[in-house]
Amino acid sequence: MNNKTIRKIFDLKNLSLGRNAWIWWFWLFFFKNPSNSQKPRQVAILWSAKNDANIKCNGIELGTKNPLKEDGSVHGGIAAWYFDGKKMHDNFLLSRVKINQIPLGLYTPYPDTKFQFKEDFFKITIKDKMKFKATLIKDKNKFITPWVKEHKYFGLGYDMTGINKLNLKATINGKKSNGTAYFQKVLLNAPAVPWYWGIFHFKHGAFLSYFNPHFLGKSLKKDVSFYDGKILHKFDNIKVKGTGNSLPTFHIKACNNEKTIDFLVKSYSKTTWNFRKKKFGFIPTTFDYRQYPAKITNFKFNNMKNGSTISEKDIGIGIGNAEHSTGILI
């Protein structure tokens, strides 16, 4: 990762948050479950700030008007959940915080959390209970290397920085484990609309992500990216069908002119961040951000041009996280 990208992740001095703009730093950690290898443990942590004094998450007020402060800090919120292998701890962290900047890093004093870059890895700590070391993977493929995306239209849109996979060493309550991690930083200057999203890491080195935001029945983006360990395959067409209620299965299909991909995303736990606010002080708006620790099964990839195929037997089961959000947050 070059120095420019690193500085972009942590830069608060040049940050501009217009009315209702939203910034967040989000980590997902996937690591071994000694009691059930088919259901890896997961932790998600989100540091965020939204220029909106009226927003609540799971009943807790997290919004702040003009969150950027003269001392370089940001007043916002922190949220985290933890699937311990058996049980989901929904509000593992959930409170208003002051986000302070340190060299190539951020920290909050209450609760005590830190996120900092050192040489070729990120160090993330949550109180004295959890420590994570997420190391960059040396690979020239653009799906693995850190990426930056920007999309703006008439001043509205988003600016993203992400890393689709890092190698992970985790220490939970003094016990060590290992796995993989995912990171994104997002500056959103537009309404939050419903979406399907997922990121998955496979046993034999493959990775997959999909993203399908939609509004009033119309898809705003259709994207599936699959890295088979050698080649990155892109699809700009996707169909998502969810079945089941509490722990759904998502059937996902995508295709392009030469290739098709088809797989199931089976969730094994669930948590939700429920965002609530009143527009103009009296019009209620809701946004339910559901997250599912999940695995990919029944994977099928077909290259119609050369006849090659890739199945679950070739790449193993994919472990990761699926999201399904509903509502709208203006």
Label for each model-derived stretch:
Residues 1-330:
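Structured soluble/peripheral alpha/beta segments that form catalytic or ligand/cofactor-binding pockets
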